[in-house]
Regions:
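Active-site SXXK
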Residues: 78-92
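Short pre-active-site segment immediately N-terminal to the catalytic Zn-binding motif
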Residues: 69-77
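Hydrophobic helical h-region of N-terminal Sec-dependent signal peptides
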Residues: 13-19
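Non-catalytic beta-strand/loop surface segments
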Residues: 28-70, 96-129, 166-220, 244-291, ...
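A common structural junction motif
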Residues: 139-147, 241-249, 364-375
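N-terminal secretory signal peptides that target proteins for export/translocation
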Residues: 1-8
């Protein structure tokens, strides 16, 4: 959920909810080793805490990450994690609906929330002296949420309108929705984060409360605080607020989900829509995530995606835009931050009249050439430098740091793995890139989607 709960604080880029999870890859976890190391500890009730010092401005970002997302929903209840995210702003017995948000607004801060396949998060960015108040609010709603039908049902309508805006009225989002459903035949990543419309329409107060009581607890969460703070000085306040919330012993320590069978055949999806102005070709490959990959594979996939898909020097751009002039743009992203098997996505915007078959052949040729022929050392060095530079520049955003650590820890990475990501990128070799391309970028592991304009004449209604 986004704009409805945003309040102004200059310089902060709001997180996306559905389309960020559906259409794009979140930033790879990254931090340079020159930054102060995060401080981590765990409370007696199981709450994990990560404190990231950043003393440049007297501002702090608090994020609470719950280890539950759309992939943890009961079949038939898709969209429930995202629906509950909306409802978490409806107040508690101690703090009526709106008081939390009004307090953030009054101090000149910003708040929002986001839902992903694997996690749900809530954050506030406020002046340093308001952190204790934010802790009290957030700890209270961890188990104190009060829901009534009179505010649950209207919020369901808000979610449905969000679905209309982000998916139903966006042909490219609908294509990605269908690609994901085809890519994951068995795993719940095949369900959209926002849910299927016909299931959203049936979600109830009882559904939301049951999900809340099952998953929202300190031993299923990580608190991330980034900003002008000292870990030892704020720990007593964390103990005073979050430390008083009882744990939920029934929550399993590991997530058990149905896994994908070995892919046996390539799949295709075609979506025709009269509203399409720019056709698209998207290909998604089923690949390991940072938590399921063998040693060295995840950073190699990061570099591979950058090599073939980012910028005007990328191999796909050179082949399809410059050489063959089949496309106006190309892109490739690797979604590494996930609990289970993830994807590497290729996107091509064709030139008018370009043949999809020719574009597919060109994509295949780029991958085949990368596998069979030596990767120039200057290309490898360039893309690794780009990735590491992006990590350095991103440190200007305090909230991006909190997001990197929160997302990484929540899917199962250690703080050291996140912090040392640049070193892992530096260590990637050309042979490793060729190995992961050969192993994972094969047609049988892919779904190719075509977005085309529907030129079928509209049917005229029969008159009696």
């Amino acid at each position: 959920m986004m704009a409805a709960r945003r309040v102004a604080l200059p310089g902060f880029a709001a997180l996306t909810v559905y389309l960020a999870a559906l259409l794009a890859s979140p930033p790879a976890p990254a931090q340079t080793v020159t930054s102060p190391p995060p401080v981590t500890f765990t409370l007696a009730n199981g709450l994990g805490v990560v404190v990231i010092p950043d003393h440049r401005t007297p501002v702090v970002t608090q994020m609470i990450w719950y280890k539950v997302g759309s992939a943890d929903e009961t079949p038939g209840k898709s969209g429930l994690a995202h629906f509950l995210e909306h409802l978490m702003f409806k107040g508690t017995a101690r703090y009526p609906a709106g008081e939390f948000s009004q307090t953030v607004l009054r101090v000149g801060g910003e708040e929002n929330a986001f839902t992903n396949f694997d996690y749900t998060g809530y954050y506030q960015r406020v002046p340093r002296d308001q952190l204790a108040a934010m802790m009290a609010f957030e700890a209270d709603r961890m188990t104190g949420l009060v829901l009534k039908d009179e505010n649950v049902l209207p919020e369901r309508d808000v979610v449905l309108e969000e679905y209309n805006m982000r998916v139903a009225n966006n042909p490219d989002a609908r294509l990605v929705e269908q690609i994901m459903a085809a890519l994951y035949l068995n795993h719940p990543y095949g369900r959209p984060v926002i849910g299927w419309r016909q299931e959203i329409e049936k979600l109830t107060r009882e559904d939301a409360l049951a999900f809340y009581k099952r998953f929202y607890a300190p031993n299923n969460a990580t608190l991330v605080i980034a900003g002008d703070v000292d870990a030892q000085k704020i720990r007593p306040e964390i103990e005073k607020t979050f430390g008083q919330v009882p744990s939920q012993p029934a929550i399993p320590s590991t997530r058990i989900r149905p896994q994908e069978p070995l892919p046996a055949a390539p799949r295709t999806v075609t979506l025709a829509d009269a509203r399409v102005e720019q056709p698209m070709l998207r290909r998604y490959y089923l690949v390991p995530s940072s938590t399921t990959a063998a040693a060295g594979e995840s950073p190699a996939l990061d570099v591979l995606a950058q090599l073939i898909g980012d910028g005007s020097n990328a191999y796909l751009y050179r082949a399809l835009v410059v050489d063959k002039q089949l496309a106006v743009s190309t892109n490739a992203t690797y979604q590494g931050t996930a609990v289970d098997a993830s994807y590497l996505a290729v996107a091509v915007a064709p030139k008018p009249g370009a043949d999809f078959a020719a574009i597919e052949q060109a994509i295949d040729a780029v991958i085949e050439n990368l596998i069979k022929n030596p990767i120039p050392a200057e290309d490898l060095e360039r893309v690794k430098t780009q990735l590491i530079a992006q990590a350095v520049y991103a440190q200007d955003s305090q909230t991006t740091l909190a997001r990197w650590y929160g997302a990484g820890v929540t899917v199962g990475l250690s703080v050291d793995e996140i912090r040392n990501w640049p070193d892992r990128i530096r260590a990637v070799t050309a042979a490793q890139i060729q190995d992961v391309a050969r192993k994972w970028l094969v047609k049988t592991r892919s779904v190719t989607g075509y977005l085309i304009k529907d030129t079928t004449p509209a049917r005229e209604e029969k008159r009696s």
